[in-house]
Amino acid sequence: MSIVTPYEDLLRFVLETGTPKSDRTGTGTRSLFGQQMRYDLSAGFPLLTTKKVHFKSVAYELLWFLRGDSNIGWLHEHGVTIWDEWASDTGELGPIYGVQWRSWPAPSGEHIDQISAALDLLRTDPDSRRIIVSAWNVGEIERMALPPCHAFFQFYVADGRLSCQLYQRSADLFLGVPFNIASYALLTHMMAAQAGLSVGEFIWTGGDCHIYDNHVEQVRLQLSREPRPYPKLLLADRDSIFEYTYEDIVVKNYDPHPAIKAPVAV
């Protein structure tokens, strides 16, 4: 059986042809601009198999975003520490992803729940070209612990299938992007379930797609491994997208190669 490997193909392409660049963290990267990956979500759940991805962290982070939360306290209650490097002493991160998704400030003083608005359009006007959620709030970026890397996503319905395209302005290919692929694939499954649709494609579009210089050996190790079949996602029935719990999300037949550790560039 042929296994599609969009992520590994992009990783190899950047490793072999990327341009050396400096970066905000001072680590150094090799980078390409404007790359894309496509996954057919009906063919399997795109949780990478060439290294183990910590799916518990992926799922809890998405549930945390959907809560509209900006404090790592809830993540800590569930044993997830992936945001610790950027949080304040009190655990605050400012108006990051979840706040913008669920409570974008309007000029009137009210707040816009972009997730609910997107779901409403999927149900009532699925051919709309305006089913968009943005985390890139220019007026609040300075208050965010980290400006959004995965900044903007759009939903598209055709033949009863829901597809999602993400634009990621800054893509740490080795550490960050495997999480992002799984997270938005999971979100697409949730949105499809709530709108009575099947899943279509997840399309990832990257701006600055980079491999940090101190990740190169880990990348070479990952690319030396044979890919395995993708797992299957099972999602419990819930009346609202905001009611899902971690126990409602099950990944079956996930058989990855071992995890590969690498330092985070902060």
Curated annotation (Swiss-Prot):
(6R)-5,10-methylene-5,6,7,8-tetrahydrofolate binds at residues 54, 172, 265. Transmembrane segments: none annotated. Its main location: cytoplasm. DUMP binds at residues 24, 129-130, 169-172, 180, 210-212. It is an enzyme of class 2 (transferase). GO terms for cellular component: cytosol. Keywords: Antibiotic resistance, Cytoplasm, Methyltransferase, Nucleotide biosynthesis, Transferase. Its EC number is 2.1.1.45. Induction: Is expressed under the exponential phase of growth, and down-regulated upon reaching the stationary phase or under both oxidative and nitrosative stress. Expression of thyA is significantly increased within murine macrophages or under acid stress. Is expressed at a higher level than thyX under all of the in vitro and in vivo growth conditions tested. Disruption phenotype: Cells lacking this gene display an in vitro growth defect, but deletion of thyA does not affect M.tuberculosis in vivo growth. Moreover, thyA deletion confers PAS resistance. CDD domains: TS_Pyrimidine_HMase. GO terms for biological process: dTMP biosynthetic process; dTTP biosynthetic process; dUMP catabolic process; methylation; response to antibiotic. Mutations within this gene have been associated with resistance to p-aminosalicylic acid (PAS) in some PAS-resistant M.tuberculosis clinical isolates and spontaneous mutants. It seems that functional ThyA is required for M.tuberculosis to be sensitive to PAS. Catalyzes the reductive methylation of 2'-deoxyuridine-5'-monophosphate (dUMP) to 2'-deoxythymidine-5'-monophosphate (dTMP) while utilizing 5,10-methylenetetrahydrofolate (mTHF) as the methyl donor and reductant in the reaction, yielding dihydrofolate (DHF) as a by-product. This enzymatic reaction provides an intracellular de novo source of dTMP, an essential precursor for DNA biosynthesis. Belongs to the thymidylate synthase family. Bacterial-type ThyA subfamily. This is Thymidylate synthase ThyA. It comes from Mycobacterium tuberculosis (strain ATCC 25618 / H37Rv).
